[in-house]
């Protein structure tokens, strides 16, 4: 993998069974990141189980299992290259925890591929009130992902196959919805593909002569820009995992969101307030002297044991530590709730890699979702479709920052009853007092 090309974190989103895993698997295979032997083996295995059409999806699951078995400092991500960029696909999608992962994963993504099925009934299911196409688009927008490519998948399964009319119907419907969320739809390519046959992934499909836009890989190189690196901001690394590696020591793993981490730095982990010294940094098994925003790293710290820190903690420099919130004020949008949200309601807040319950202590104002203007002060309750300014008190210590200062740590989703209740951005934080304690 060349480290010379700009690096982009990509998330693949969309409704269950619309072909996300097949698309990623086929792409990896066609770009040469999986060998023929593995594909043949998977084909045999899939045939035996009568699941021939799942071979590329299986490929992804296989890669995932292999990776999960070997304990590596590396983050468990799938990588591939195009002519222009070096991509990491974060969280190759599964079913259950996907929205939860989408919330934590998307906050680290620079761009997204939305996969929608063109098959009759499937597209409609994804756009229904319970549909994940709709939910993932809303989440991606809140999580700050403006760079999007839409793959209109299963074009071989439309009626008739490769139907231009069906493609245009889907594009028109999606454009209208995405526009309402604030996406710049004229800057988003909609590519008719078949993840199963590989059409329009890399080469143009002869079956869709009516389409003259880019293939999926061309679109990745043309429409996506590498993120600008916020190197001048204070260091923030939300922790995803912590390993204790024999002969090495404690190794936290996470993505640098802002600032720069160097070997030899003293870092503090909040909320616990423990301090350690950085002995080494590694990315994709390569040692680094320093890590910058966008780098997914493992770093060995002296003076801290595995039990001192956990997923959801945030590392920063001792002189400008991450903010632990006593309470915070946020602008929220309610996506779904069976009845009404009142003061005292306690959803789980998913921000960066943390998930912590927080109680609503005050509903200050209801807003017009389109303009952000106050339409009612101190409303009694909020329901689906409402936007509001709300004050939260986390049940236990949690790092969260103002969106204006650290967008990556200032966005969140509210979850309850296995669903995303709402999304929000932090407008103000009342910091808690935390003692920073260096171990002798």
Swiss-Prot record:
Its main location: cytoplasm. Residues 5-228 form the tr-type G domain. It is an enzyme of class 3 (hydrolase). Residues 14-21 are annotated as: G1. Transmembrane segments: none annotated. Keywords: Cytoplasm, Elongation factor, GTP-binding, Hydrolase, Magnesium, Metal-binding, Nucleotide-binding, Protein biosynthesis. One of its GO terms (molecular function) is translation elongation factor activity. Residues 91-94 are annotated as: G3. It catalyses: GTP + H2O = GDP + phosphate + H(+). It is found in: Cytoplasm. This is Elongation factor 1-alpha.
């Amino acid at each position: 993998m060349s480290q010379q090309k700009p690096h982009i974190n990509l998330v693949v989103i969309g409704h269950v069974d619309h072909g996300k895993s097949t698309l990623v698997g086929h792409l990896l295979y066609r770009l040469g990141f999986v060998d023929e032997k593995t594909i043949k083996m998977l084909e045999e295995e899939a045939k035996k189980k009568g699941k021939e059409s799942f071979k590329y999806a299986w490929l992804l699951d296989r890669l995932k299992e292999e990776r999960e078995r070997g304990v590596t400092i590396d983050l468990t991500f799938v990588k591939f290259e195009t002519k222009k960029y070096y991509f990491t696909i974060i969280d190759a999608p599964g079913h259950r925890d996907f929205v939860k992962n989408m919330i934590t994963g998307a906050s680290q993504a620079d761009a997204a591929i939305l996969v929608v099925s063109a098959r009759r009934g499937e597209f409609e299911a994804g756009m229904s009130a319970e549909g994940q196409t709709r939910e993932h688009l809303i989440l991606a927008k809140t999580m700050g992902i403006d760079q999007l490519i839409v793959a209109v998948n299963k074009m071989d399964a439309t009626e008739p196959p490769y139907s231009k009319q069906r493609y245009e119907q889907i594009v028109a419907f999606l454009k209208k919805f995405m526009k309402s969320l604030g996406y710049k739809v004229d800057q988003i390519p909609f590519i008719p593909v078949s993840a199963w046959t590989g059409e329009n992934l890399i080469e143009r499909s002869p079956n869709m002569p009516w389409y003259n836009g880019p293939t999926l890989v061309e679109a990745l190189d043309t429409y996506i820009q590498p993120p600008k690196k916020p190197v001048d901001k204070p260091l923030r690394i939300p922790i995803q995992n912590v390993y204790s590696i024999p002969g090495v020591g404690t190794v936290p793993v996470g993505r640098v969101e802002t600032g720069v981490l160097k070997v030899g730095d003293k870092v503090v982990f909040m909320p616990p307030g423990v301090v350690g010294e950085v002995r080494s940094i590694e990315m994709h098994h390569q040692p680094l002297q320093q890590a910058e925003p966008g780098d997914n790293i493992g770093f060995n710290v002296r003076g801290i044991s595995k039990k001192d820190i956990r997923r959801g903690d945030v590392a920063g420099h001792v002189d400008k530590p991450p903010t632990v919130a006593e309470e915070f004020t946020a602008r929220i949008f309610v996506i779904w709730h069976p009845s009404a949200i009142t003061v005292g309601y306690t959803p789980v807040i998913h921000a960066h890699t943390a998930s912590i319950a927080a109680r609503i202590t005050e509903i200050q104002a209801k807003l017009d979702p389109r303009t952000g203007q106050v339409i009612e002060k101190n409303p009694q309750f909020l329901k689906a479709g409402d936007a509001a300014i709300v004050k939260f008190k986390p049940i236990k210590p949690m790092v969260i920052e103002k969106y204006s200062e650290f967008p990556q740590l200032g966005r969140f989703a509210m979850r309850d009853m296995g669903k995303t209740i709402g999304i929000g951005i932090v407008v103000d934080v009342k910091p808690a007092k935390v003692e920073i304690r260096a171990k002798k």
